[in-house]
Amino acid sequence: WHDRVGFDREWLGDFDLSILFDWDRAGDVIEYGDYTGRAKWERALQVPHQNIRDALISMITVQGDTEFASVEQQRHLLDTAPTDYDRYAGARIMAEEQRHGWQMAYLLMTYFGQQGRREAQKLLERNAQDGDRLLGAFNRPMPHWLDFFCYTMFVDRDGKFQLGMLSTSAFKPLAASMGPMLKEESFHLGTGSNGLRRIIKAGVIPLDMLQRYMNKWVATAHDLFGTDSSTSAHWAYVWGVKGRWDERKKLEGDIDVDKEVLNEESRGHYHDEIVKEVEKLNGSLPEGSDITLTVPHENFNRDIGNFGGKNCYTDGRLFEGSDDEYATYIQTVLPTAADEEALKEIFKQQWVEDKPLTPRQLASGIGATA
């Protein structure tokens, strides 16, 4: 797989790709759904029905697919890293995504027999560069670091929510995998938010252009939560294999669950979080700036869900003009060919504030030979 996608193993430095579990955090007792109170399942044979096993295989497969796909989307960026720190950060993120992919492959191969082994093999056969990864967002090209910073800020944050919802799963090896993955995921989110803050501080990329790239990736992340009323999310909750965001806090607070709109609920939590994160970014804007960065509404530029394919303004209102008029409007709120052309010159400048490597980061060798 490394050779096929063009990832040099030396870029990993001293990073350890070991399989990691946090069994204590996973818990021993099923926490929600029809099997509440029973012991969590530690082997696939303990899972009471084949359709639940199939759902688990599907969830693990999709998660693993996104992890390997991210590396395939991003590996070429190490050639154009704007600073030594960013080369390190990019290589570390790709190393951690690989570890997460291997973790999911390990679960499939260890617990789900021949079916699991087939799915694990396919994780390494599909390729984002060929456009055949399972989720469309993970087949999208990522030509440059402005896309990368927006991606790690917004799309990787969706990943945090997905991992969090699996962290209370009734299938104990899956739940136990999530703790270490969430710890590593926090670095990805920090890379995104710090990267965007450093872009603002450098003052080279126009803020209206930055806003267009943010709009692009926020809309993509909104879609990743799935359809608003999902039967698969409903049954995953009933079976206890995938919970709500902050499930344990909600159970402690006796907050009722609406199983018909679980995806919509988690998307709402995600949206609220990125609004707060972008408000923090606005604290770095130059004094007197006439532009404030915003988060587009959940309805904007959606491909799936109740507003999938509908023409909406960034504030969520339906666009009342023609499709041609909407195409003209979209040119003002999403990246254009002219933006891509302008970035070629911008990237020749110091377009992102420098950030020094710590001695530990330097000693790790991660990304050093890229």
What kind of feature is each model-predicted range?
Residues 1-88, 110-142, 146, 225-370:
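Terminal targeting/low-complexity segments that flank the catalytic cores of oxidoreductases
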Residues 63-71, 93-108, 127-131, 152-160, ...:
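Alpha-helical transition-metal enzyme core signature, strongest for iron centers
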Residues 77, 165-166:
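Alpha-solenoid HEAT/Armadillo-like helical repeat scaffolds in large eukaryotic proteins
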Residues 109-110, 201:
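Short, surface-exposed basic-aromatic patches at helix termini and helix-loop junctions that form
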Residues 144-150, 161:
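Active-site-adjacent structural elements in folded domains
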Residues 159-163, 274:
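Hydrophobic alpha-helical core bundles mediating ligand binding, dimerization, or RNAP-core interactions
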Residues 169-220:
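Glycine- and acidic-residue-rich phosphate-binding/metal-coordinating active-site segment common to enzymes
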